UniProtKB/Swiss-Prot annotation:
Interacts with WRKY33. It comes from Arabidopsis thaliana (Mouse-ear cress). May modulate WRKY transcription factor activities. One of its GO terms (cellular component) is nucleus. Keywords: Nucleus. It holds the Pfam family VQ. This is VQ motif-containing protein 1. InterPro entries: VQ, VQ_1/10. Its main location: nucleus. The lineage of its organism: Eukaryota, Viridiplantae, Streptophyta, Embryophyta, Tracheophyta. It is found in: Nucleus.
Amino acid sequence: MSAGVRSEPMKVVFINTQYVQTDARSFKTIVQELTGKNAVVADGPYEFSGQGYGGKDSSQRFCGVGKEAERGVETTEFDSFFREMPPVGELYNLWSDH
């Protein structure tokens, strides 16, 4: 280095790529573990119109989802959970009454 020339220290960032497969219920927890940050979720009014994206009934979005198997479609335990679950609007009404 020549006299009088000052350089800034170099910042080095290491990126550790990880591939994670999770379900919707565990997504928030996984993100918090990977980022080391807690999410802040604001309370607010929750409304359920009974219709999903594009005006379609959202209860149909979870039916028929499964892994492709060699001999047809294999239904997962997660899919069964959503088929047996009451509508989200009904759950919200039950929880908000207490």
